[in-house]
Amino acid sequence: MSNPPSKLYIGLMSGTSLDGVDAALVSIQNGELELKAFQTFPYTDNLKKQLHHLNQTPHVDLKALCDMEYQVANAFSEATQQLLDNCDHVASDIRAIGSHGQTIFHAPDIPMSLQIGHPAFIAKNTGITTVADFRIDDMANNGQGAPLAPAFHQKLFGNTVGTAVVNIGGISNITFLDQQKTLGFDTGPGNGLMDEYCEQFFNCSYDADGKMAQTGQVNMALLSDLMQEPYFRLPAPKTTGKDLFNSDWLNPFLAKYSNVSKKDILSTLNQLTVDTIIQGLNTLPSQPKRLLICGGGAENKTLISRLQAQLSYPVKTTQSVGVPPHAIEAMMCAWLAEQRLNNTPIALQHITGATKDSVLGAVWHP
């Protein structure tokens, strides 16, 4: 009699902030998820620099792209092995890895989405079955391929009707858990523009706790100009990324407002994230009863306090309901792997605009 499959999965995620690899060890049994361990393994400075360049360069050298594909796969493999070592597990304990990869280009209008960090290398390097390439099946069914997070938010928080979940990574997205259907879409910039501005002008990778933004003043003229971006007025379903909201998008505004102090600009970028989230919340079919925040933006106290100041309902991080804000997307990847191995379609029609729900991802064996 064969042994039952392991209930343990590893989820690997690197978002548009390009911080490194988020790795989650997740138990999934009888439809219930339990986070066993979570760690972030930072990219090397050199790899991060190369990925930033690749992410903002639509015309790339194929050799450089293949080199990055290989390097990111190795980074994901090393993160897996370190997580296993730190948790006293071995490869045979794990049923599968769910690897999102590193998004380099996402273009629903083509439609195509490119994530690098080839899963064949991850599977062979770790000795663990690897599930990846989650977005393209949805796009093949006329969906936007993003955001995927709302489907997982439904899984985690689906019994809390009237909850809105906002994931603030490099880009922000909203999930609204409603009795009729789950809605979700990208609102616009999250931490991405602020992080790039900090790297360029403050010699740091991000604004810790939003402290620098708090000391600045919002420049209302600049904010008004930023808010004219056509994406903000598009109806859902919609998705965006760093291919739009990057330094190339921001630089013309910086040139126009060159007399504005750096801290005031950072404060204004913080408010841009707040206002575009509020704008997205205002398009929902009914007012949420509460707002849960996850992603790196959950640590930006200035951003959170500004959101709460403009909303009449409670704003809390997902930690308040027992789920670490940083771990959710990596947990999602573990769940997507389990769903793929069970051939379970993911309900995305009301989120991405797909014509039918899809079984997401492909499988690579060790």
Curated annotation (Swiss-Prot):
Enzyme nomenclature, EC number: 2.7.1.170
Protein's pathway: Amino-sugar metabolism; 1,6-anhydro-N-acetylmuramate degradation; Cell wall biogenesis; peptidoglycan recycling
Catalytic activities: 1,6-anhydro-N-acetyl-beta-muramate + ATP + H2O = N-acetyl-D-muramate 6-phosphate + ADP + H(+)
InterPro entries cross-referenced by the UniProt entry: Anhydro_N_Ac-Mur_kinase, ATPase_NBD
Highest taxon, organism lineage: Bacteria
Keyword Magnesium: no
One annotated GO biological process: peptidoglycan turnover
UniProt keyword list: ATP-binding, Carbohydrate metabolism, Kinase, Nucleotide-binding, Transferase
Keyword Transferase in record: yes
GO MF assignments: ATP binding; kinase activity; phosphotransferase activity, alcohol group as acceptor
Binding locations of ATP: 15-22
Function per UniProt: Catalyzes the specific phosphorylation of 1,6-anhydro-N-acetylmuramic acid (anhMurNAc) with the simultaneous cleavage of the 1,6-anhydro ring, generating MurNAc-6-P. Is required for the utilization of anhMurNAc either imported from the medium or derived from its own cell wall murein, and thus plays a role in cell wall recycling.
Family statement: Belongs to the anhydro-N-acetylmuramic acid kinase family.
Annotated protein name in UniProt: Anhydro-N-acetylmuramic acid kinase
Taxonomic source organism: Hydrogenovibrio crunogenus (strain DSM 25203 / XCL-2)
This protein's encoding gene: anmK
